[in-house]
């Protein structure tokens, strides 16, 4: 998936608006994923999956940090996410569809919190960005 210059600008702009809430929003998106798609819980049998648990918050921060790195290095997603791709493909063996499910729930969460800043153009660009991140994260599965 090729991100246009406009897409990259929208992603960087909205990530700037997310700011210090990135970990909180990512944790909410993760929790939303667990509720909307219960099969995703199978990868977290050791987690306390209750609302706002410390483990969900901590994993949300990891997700947010990885996305922040991806935004910062938007022109080199494969290089930026290579180690994370290895981890998910070879050690964790996460079903690739779960990245799409999480991406969807992250979009819903961002839309709920960002209001008018989450324009249709931003939505489309962020969707393309998350799809590109998902593609990179699943690239080592082949």
UniProtKB/Swiss-Prot annotation:
- Provide any one GO MF term from the record: oxygen binding
Membrane-crossing residue ranges in chain numbering: none
Q: According to the UniProt record, list the residues that bear Phosphotyrosine.
A: 25
Q: Which domain of life is it from?
A: Eukaryota
Q: Does the keyword Heme apply?
A: yes
Which parts of the sequence bind O2?
A: 59
Pfam families, from UniProt? Globin (PF00042)
Where does the entry say this protein is expressed, by tissue?
Red blood cells.
- What residues bear N6-acetyllysine in this entry? 17
What the protein does comes down to: Involved in oxygen transport from the lung to the various peripheral tissues.
Provide this UniProt record's keywords sorted from A to Z: Acetylation, Heme, Iron, Metal-binding, Oxygen transport, Phosphoprotein, Transport
Q: Where on the chain is Phosphothreonine found, per UniProt?
A: 109, 135, 138
The processes (GO biological process) annotated in the record are: hydrogen peroxide catabolic process
- In this chain, heme b is annotated as bound at 88
Q: What is this protein called?
A: Hemoglobin subunit alpha
Is Cytoplasm tagged as a keyword? no
Q: How does it assemble?
A: Heterotetramer of two alpha chains and two beta chains.
Q: Upper lineage ranks? A: Eukaryota, Metazoa, Chordata, Craniata, Vertebrata
The UniProt entry, under InterPro entries, shows: Globin, Globin-like_sf, Globin/Proto, Hemoglobin_a-typ, Hemoglobin_oxygen_transport, Hemoglobin_pi
Entry GO CC? blood microparticle; haptoglobin-hemoglobin complex; hemoglobin complex
Residue numbers carrying Phosphoserine: 4, 36, 50, 103, 125, 139
Q: Which family does it belong to?
A: Belongs to the globin family.
Q: Which residues carry this modification: N6-succinyllysine?
A: 8, 12, 17, 41
Q: Please state every residue range assigned to the domain named Globin.
A: 2-142
